[in-house]
Amino acid sequence: MAAKGAREKIRLVSSAETGHFYTTDKNKRNMPEKMEIKKFDPVVRKHVIYREAKIK
């Protein structure tokens, strides 16, 4: 049986407080800190910073 993977699913939540989010996964061993990426928010129609949050 294979070992459990190091990748964990995360949610990237918009910093513009619109409620919009992206889902992705990341490798916890290579990147233990919280992820911050600048992506497009279609609600405000601008590029904003998306911060990592746990999937409920």
Swiss-Prot record:
Q: Name one GO molecular function term.
A: structural constituent of ribosome
Record-level GO cellular component terms? cytosolic large ribosomal subunit
PROSITE patterns named in the record: RIBOSOMAL_L33 (PS00582)
The UniProt entry, under Pfam families, shows: Ribosomal_L33
Q: Keyword Ribosomal protein on this protein?
A: yes
Record's keyword terms, sorted:
Ribonucleoprotein, Ribosomal protein
Which Gene3D superfamilies does the record cross-reference, listed alphabetically? Ribosomal protein L33
Q: Which domain of life is it from?
A: Bacteria
Q: Give GO BP annotations, semicolon-separated.
A: translation
The record's PANTHER family line, in alphabetical order, gives: 54S RIBOSOMAL PROTEIN L39, MITOCHONDRIAL, LARGE RIBOSOMAL SUBUNIT PROTEIN BL33M
Q: Which NCBIfam families match?
A: PRK00595.1, rpmG_bact
Q: Tell me its family.
A: Belongs to the bacterial ribosomal protein bL33 family.
Q: What is this protein called?
A: Large ribosomal subunit protein bL33
Organism of derivation? Actinobacillus succinogenes (strain ATCC 55618 / DSM 22257 / CCUG 43843 / 130Z)
